[in-house]
Amino acid sequence: MPLVAAACCALALAAPASSAVLPGFPEDARRHAAAPAERERFLVPLRGRWESGFGLRWGRLHSGVDISVVSNARVRAAASGTVIATGWLRNHWGYGLVVKIRHRPGLVTMYAHLSAAAVRRGERVERGERIATAGCTGSCTGTHLHFEVHTRGRAVDPWPYLRGKLR
């Protein structure tokens, strides 16, 4: 099974931005891809090792990317915005401690499995500002950041949004 996950990650990395959704996903998922102008504003939330990409994993959608890091790594806001949630999400306990930021109407990022949040709901944050500490809360197998991007309420592949390298 690890080979399948690695193949999914390689496919997601190699795919052009217009086809970042893995084959087999509903066509309407492609309609929610990011516009190039939106992608330019994002920073990689932290440096670490790419562990798992967006797409099918074990028969289910893995709706973000996982970045493995050392304990207590600082997590930065990918873009400026307003914190709309911190804490454990009802009905999504597997994410553990999360921070969600709205960057503009219809564009939200989520940072999960955190050990501590450095921001509060309603707080304005700037691109690159420290918002949390990476951890292993919820369902996880080691310290990492699970990072998601949502456009118009749907998870989309975060890879096209990220600037810089994850490794």
Question: PLM features: residue spans?
Answer:
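A residue-level detector for short acidic-glycine micro-motifs
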Residues: 52, 69, 85, 113-116, ...
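Conserved, short, structured surface segments that act as functional micro-motifs
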Residues: 95-103, 110, 123-167
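A generic structural motif
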Residues: 70-72, 106, 114, 129
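Surface-exposed, glycine-biased beta-strand/turn segments
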Residues: 17-97, 127, 156-159, 165
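Zn2+-dependent peptidoglycan hydrolase active-site motif and core
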Residues: 62, 78-118, 143-148
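Short, conserved secondary-structure segments in the cores of folded domains
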Residues: 63, 71-74, 115, 121, ...
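Bacterial N-terminal signal peptides
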Residues: 4-12
